[in-house]
């Protein structure tokens, strides 16, 4: 599961970085009107966060997720990331 956790976190980070770029260049309204401009859909981001949460609910996976604790915390505190995604990631940290 270690590569899966790293890939899921990286996927969310890439979307956040792209969203920041779109927001800086075109404004937050452009991102709100067209969330797919971040390179993926909100649904896929929410699924990635939900998958991380399901993994975190199993004690055996928690050490794998703890390796990415700082990255997850950074995403939780993001000003641009979808609030549902951020909330799920906060729950991931809570379980770990």
Residues covered by each model-derived region:
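Alpha-helical solenoid repeats of the armadillo/HEAT superfamily
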Residues: 1-67, 80-96
């Amino acid at each position: 599961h270690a590569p899966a956790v790293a890939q899921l976190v990286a996927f969310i980070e890439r979307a956040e970085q792209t969203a920041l770029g779109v927001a800086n260049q075109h404004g937050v309204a452009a991102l709100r009107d067209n969330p797919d401009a971040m390179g993926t859909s909100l649904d896929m981001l929410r699924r990635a966060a939900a998958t991380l949460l399901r993994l975190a609910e199993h004690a055996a996976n928690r050490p794998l997720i703890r390796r990415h604790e700082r990255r997850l915390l950074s995403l939780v505190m993001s000003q641009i990331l979808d609030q549902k995604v951020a909330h799920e990631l906060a729950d991931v940290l809570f379980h770990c």
